[in-house]
A protein has these predicted regions:
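N-terminal glycine-rich dinucleotide-binding loop that anchors FAD/FMN and/or NAD(P) in oxidoreductases
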Residues: 1-5
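Glycine- and aromatic-enriched mobile tails/lids
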Residues: 6, 13-16, 30-57, 101-102, ...
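Helix-loop-beta segment of a Rossmann-like dinucleotide-binding subdomain
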Residues: 10-14, 45-71, 134-138, 267-279
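Alpha-helix capping and helix-loop boundary segments enriched in small/acidic/polar residues
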Residues: 15, 61-65, 114, 118, ...
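Conserved redox-cofactor binding core of oxidoreductases
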Residues: 27-117, 129, 173-187, 192
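A glycine-rich dinucleotide-binding beta-alpha-beta segment and adjacent secondary-structure elements
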Residues: 90-91, 96-104, 110-111, 284-338
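Glycine-rich loop(s) and the adjacent beta-strand/alpha-helix scaffold that form part
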Residues: 125-181, 342-365
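An anion/pyrophosphate-binding glycine-rich loop and adjacent beta-alpha core
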Residues: 153, 160-294, 365-368, 423
Length: 433
């Protein structure tokens, strides 16, 4: 609880954070029951490790792919419910708008991405679980399908937004390596457990690295500046993400960047390999090392990784109350789509924890408070005027966009606006820079 509140610069809603801490143990039990293969000690007990911003090892993990394994566990449980008929799944649909009837959320309009047709869905309540708005920036680590259209539709209908300026810059991303990229690749936070972050002490060494006449392994140990360990001895390389990102940018702005663009620092595992052995490091991070080598063609066992901060997560989102309902009655927002749990900065692994807590242990109970006085309300017809008007407005907007005779693509406009957003975010003197 304290680490989360402090790591978020005391800007999180403490009641929600306290509840998150209370249900955290139950989250692990739930995931184990779903078959998530968490790492275990030799005796069979669950293993854990430190993540950024916490000085206690309390993060349970599944090698370097915890998020993926949690998704597989959740999808397996969902598929079981689909199979027995308790859940109907609509794949390849995109929400276009939320429908309000007498001021309450009563359904949505969605587009079938296979046929292109709009379809109406009525409900007694609507839950938004569509992630954040990181792709407003260019580049980010978010998948391109995470476009925030659902949350923005709710905002346009009157739902409040909270803390939209709070976005997280993740310190361990693979640097930009071309002008054709649509997104950046995130390297797991777990790498900072054993990897040491450094830049050269001498500016001439940094210039040589940028020119390609030297490699990281050619820099003597005495000439390496482990700047996080130097500045923050209590945390070392496991400082909160915002601190690590600002420190990396400061070193690169000072001219100590280590790649051709000058926008990278080293994440070095040579000390861990010497201390633990290559096989132990491979067992812990092998899949991440393989991914890094496939993207960069550099072997991280032999030469230090290059990393640089990149836009990763949005702490802001739709405003919700303690029961996760937005300012629109009947409209709920969970996970990264809401603002409640992280304040100005999210700790490592807390996004997974919040998503699981909201979905498994909070919303199933709080939504019942809202639905309890709706039990007498009959099922809504999608022929109501509100549904007809919402669909008509969407068709009009689509027709307007399709009839624009411009010469720029949507993607090019997104890139331009995203670059402006990143310029503002990285605190350049002006967007022109």
């Amino acid at each position: 609880f304290y680490d989360t509140v402090k790591g978020g610069d005391y800007r999180a809603r403490e009641a929600n954070v306290y509840r998150l801490a209370e249900v955290s143990n139950a989250i692990i039990d739930q995931c184990v029951a779903q078959g998530v293969p968490f790492a275990r000690e030799y005796g069979g007990t669950l293993d854990n490790r430190s993540f950024g911003g916490a000085q206690v090892s309390r993060t349970f993990y599944a090698k370097g792919q915890t998020g993926q394994q949690l998704l597989l566990g959740a999808y397996s449980a969902l598929s079981r419910q689909v199979n027995v008929g308790t859940v109907k799944l609509f794949t390849r649909y995109e929400m276009q708008d939320v429908v309000l009837v007498e001021g309450r959320a009563r359904g949505i309009i969605a587009k079938n991405l296979v046929t292109g047709k709009l379809e109406r869905f009525a409900a007694h309540a609507v839950v938004i679980a569509t992630g954040g708005y990181g792709n407003a920036y260019f580049l980010s680590t978010n998948a391109m399908t995470c476009n925030c259209t659902a949350a923005i539709s709710c905002y346009r209908k009157g739902a409040w937004m909270a803390n939209p300026a709070y976005v997280q810059i993740h310190p361990t991303c693979i640097p930009v390596h071309g002008d054709k990229q649509s997104k950046l690749t995130l390297m797991s936070e777990s790498l900072r457990n054993d990897g040491r972050i450094w830049v050269p002490k001498k500016l001439e060494d940094a210039k040589a690295l940028q020119a390609g006449t030297k490699k990281g392994k050619d820099i003597p140990e005495a000439d390496r500046d482990y700047y996080l360990e130097r500045r923050y001895p209590a945390f070392g390389n496991l400082v909160p993400r915002d601190v690590a990102s600002r420190a990396a940018k400061e070193r690169c702005d000072a001219g100590f960047g280590v790649n051709s663009t000058g926008l990278a620092v080293f994440l070095d595992f040579s000390d861990a390999i010497n201390r633990l052995g290559k096989e132990v490091v491979k067992q812990k991070y092998g899949n991440l090392f393989d991914m890094y080598e496939e993207i960069t063609n550099d072997d991280p066992y032999e030469t230090p990784m290059m990393i640089y901060p990149a836009l990763h997560y949005s702490m802001g989102g739709l405003w919700v109350d303690y029961e996760l309902m937005t300012s629109i009655p009947g409209l709920f927002a969970i996970g990264e789509a809401n603002f409640s749990d992280h304040g100005a900065n999210r700790l490592g692994a807390s996004a997974l924890m919040q998503g699981l807590a909201d979905g498994y242990f909070v919303l199933p109970y709080t939504i019942q408070n809202y639905l309890s006085d709706q039990i007498q309300v009959p099922r809504f017809s999608t022929d109501l005027p509100e549904f007809v008007e919402a669909e008509k407005a969407i068709n009009a907007r689509i027709a307007k966009l399709m009839n624009v005779k411009g010469k720029e693509t949507v993607d090019s406009i997104h890139r331009k606006l995203g670059h402006i957003m990143c310029c503002l975010l990285y605190t350049s003197p002006s967007p022109r820079d």
